[in-house]
Every structure is written in structure tokens, then in C-alpha cells.
A protein has these predicted regions:
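Short, flexible, mixed-charge acidic loops at enzyme active sites
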Residues: 180-190
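Conserved S-adenosyl-L-methionine
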Residues: 220-231
Length: 282
């Protein structure tokens, strides 16, 4: 069942948990080692899909001219490499100490100072009507984030709000299967200690089918879903046909279209009809 009750994306317990880890983000052999190595998959996944949509902008800086929002950026592990590809990246996180860690680390790289910024703010605060984030971004990235959220429905609506029409949403997360429980929680947290105990809650995991259904009912079209596999012996990630544990998803916000009912453009039945038409007949 999709979580939708709190109307906020932030779970206070998750904030407390990550507050304790805020100074550990850039230890490549520490609690976030698997996220560091995940960049080998997720950075090309984001880059290549954006290039397919927008084309190359500049040699060496292929994402130049694109605005990307990194939701739940933590210490900036993914924000920085996207910035090095030329994108104008805003990393946001509700944990202020994590933002502080990200800012300090980015400050040491002169190449990032002009196009990587951070804010200690929630997604819903950024996306509020009339806010600075509304309709401003070419892409939203939420990598290893949705399994920590309080409300997926609110998250989806907020992502739609901040994206430009035709903008991309990139998600990596964990499937809700018995295998994911055994490997992502029992093995990773309790046996191998790859991540701290208590990092994940299986009840918050979401299957690709559920996530796709939620996105496509809220103004997105899912373009692709790919399975990801972590090898704890080598500390590396690889693509796999199976999505039973980890997976990456790319969705696109539907382009704005003329209203079907010119007399009442605010009629919710018209909005629903438009969404269905786009989904089933495009």
C-alpha cells in the first residue's frame, strides 16, 4: 500500500537518525561506502537519459544549462558529480548538519562554486505555490530517498510541482520483497554491517509496480526501470535484469496540454480525463 497520510515527506525519526551520521558522508570506507560506489551506475544513468532528452550542451560539461534538484542530498555525494558535468544543481535536505557537511566539502573544489548550491529545506517547502522552486527544474533526483519518506503521494506531487513540463524524475530505491528484506536489512544491517542497524524499514520499501502506478496517476510517464545489484565482496554495483532488490527508475513529467473543457479549466474531472488520455492514448 502506498503511504499517503501525513502530507509531509519528512519522517522525524529519519531526521534524527541521519543527524547522527551527518559528519560521516565523505568517508568512502564508512557507513556510506555503498552510496559512493553507487555513483558508478546512477551518475551515467542520469547523464545519459538527460542527454537523450536534451542533447549535449558542451564538451566536458554535457549537462551545462540544465537545472537539477537533488532531493535528500545528504552530504552531496551525488550532487557534486552532477555539478562537475556542468549542471546547475541545488541539493536540499531537512538535516541541517548534512547540508553543512556538503557545503564545506564543495567549497574545497573551485569548479563547483558556481553551479552547486545547498539548502536545508524540505521538498514541500520548496514546491509551495509561488515558491522559488515551482516549475524551475529540468530534473529531480531522489536517490536512496523514497524508502525514508513519510508520504510518497506528497513527494510525487511536489516533484511534479517543481519540474518543468517534460522534466525528468530519477529515483533509485529498494523493492518490497522477501529477498530485499533478507539482503537489504538482515544481511546488510545485521550480518555484514554495510549500513548501520535500523537504517531501513521494510514497510517503507515500494515495488516498481506500485511506484509506477503512483507516478502515472500524478502526471508522469515512466520511461524505464532497471535492476541494480550490489556486490559486498567487491563493494561495487552492476546492472541486472532483476528488480527484486534495488532498482532505478526514470520518469518524465507530462507536457502541459490545452484543457478539454474550455468553459471550466479548473474542473477536476477534466484534469483526470486529460491524465487518462495522455497515459492510454499517447
Amino acid at each position: 500500500m502506498i503511504r499517503s497520510a501525513s502530507k509531509t515527506t519528512v519522517d522525524p525519526n529519519e531526521v534524527k537518525r541521519f543527524q547522527l551520521l551527518a559528519n560521516k558522508w565523505w568517508n568512502e570506507q564508512g557507513d556510506f561506502a555503498a552510496l559512493h560506489s553507487m555513483n558508478d551506475l546512477r551518475v551515467p544513468f542520469i547523464r545519459d537519459n538527460l542527454l537523450n532528452a536534451h542533447g549535449g550542451r558542451r564538451p566536458g560539461k554535457p549537462l551545462a544549462g540544465l537545472r537539477i534538484l537533488d532531493v535528500g542530498c545528504g552530504g552531496g555525494l551525488l550532487t557534486e558529480p552532477l555539478g562537475r558535468l556542468g549542471a546547475d544543481v541545488l541539493g536540499i535536505d531537512p538535516v541541517a548538519d548534512s547540508i553543512g557537511t556538503a557545503e564545506v566539502h564543495a567549497w574545497h573544489d573551485p569548479d563547483l562554486r558556481g553551479n552547486v548550491r545547498y539548502r536545508a529545506i524540505t521538498l514541500e517547502e520548496l514546491s509551495e505555490k509561488g515558491g522559488q522552486g515551482a516549475g524551475q527544474f529540468d530534473a529531480v533526483v531522489a536517490s536512496e530517498v523514497v524508502e525514508h519518506l513519510a508520504d510518497l503521494e506528497t513527494f510525487t506531487l511536489c516533484c511534479n510541482q517543481v519540474l518543468k513540463p517534460g522534466g525528468s524524475l530519477f529515483i533509485t530505491t529498494i523493492n518490497k520483497t522477501q529477498l530485499s528484506y533478507a539482503l537489504a536489512i538482515v544481511a546488510a544491517e545485521e550480518v555484514l554491517r554495510i549500513v548501520p542497524s535500523g537504517t531501513h524499514d521494510w514497510d517503507k520499501f515500494v515495488s516498481p509496480m506500485e511506484l509506477e502506478r503512483l507516478l502515472e496517476s500524478n502526471g508522469f510517464h515512466v520511461e524505464s526501470i532497471r535492476g541494480m545489484l550490489y556486490n559486498p565482496l567487491s563493494g561495487s554495483w552492476s546492472w541486472t535484469e532483476s528488480t527484486s532488490i534495488n532498482y532505478a527508475l526514470h520518469a518524465v513529467k507530462l507536457e502541459e496540454e490545452p484543457n478539454l473543457d474550455e468553459d471550466d479549466p479548473e474542473d477536476p474531472t477534466v484534469i483526470v480525463a486529460q491524465a487518462k488520455a495522455r497515459r492510454w492514448y499517447n
